[in-house]
Design a protein with these regions (language model features):
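Phosphodiester-processing cores and adjacent nucleic acid-binding clamps
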Residues: 1-156
Length: 156
């Protein structure tokens, strides 16, 4: 019985503290052993191991997919409250433009926020920065899932 190729998209590396456990180089080796044609790294608010991961995948003959779980603040009508509630949007680069946009958004998430809040961007920060990106919205930490779970169907 033959299996259709499977591509894991939601792997957090050891660079995502307290959540990921695998070294990006080991991820590539394991992907080859398991017969995956491609594998994605998606660290939280970071691209820390992206270059190491891409090089290791290429050495193993595996297609690397670079992504991140980007924190996106929920809009708030209360002044000073934006950034207190952050949902996560998995974003993946499909080309060089997408990688450039990922780098910009991750940098913005860290540099343009109050230090008391976790790294995030505002939804409007995505405007003009979506070329070459693929977004998944069904994650358990995503806005749609969380809003539905909170009974806010009209906002989801």
């Amino acid at each position: 019985m033959s299996f259709k190729p499977f591509v894991p998209f939601r792997i957090l590396s050891a660079y995502t503290m307290l959540e990921g456990a695998i070294d990006p180089k080991a991820m590539a080796k394991l992907a080859k052993e398991r017969g995956f044609p491609a594998v994605a790294i998606a660290d939280r608010n970071g691209l820390y191991g992206a270059v190491m991961f891409a090089n290791a995948c290429k050495a193993e003959g595996i297609q690397p997919i670079i992504g991140t779980l980007l924190g996106v603040a929920r809009p708030s009508r209360d002044e000073g409250a934006e950034g207190k509630q952050v949902d996560y949007l998995p974003l993946y680069a499909q080309d060089e433009a997408g990688y450039d946009n990922l780098c910009h958004l991750v940098s913005k998430a860290h540099l343009e926020r109050p230090l008391e809040f976790e790294p995030h961007v505002r939804i409007g920060d995505l405007d003009g920065r979506t070329d070459g990106l693929i977004a998944f919205t069904g994650a358990s930490e995503g806005a749609v899932t969380r809003l539905l779970a909170e009974g806010q169907q009209s906002h989801a």
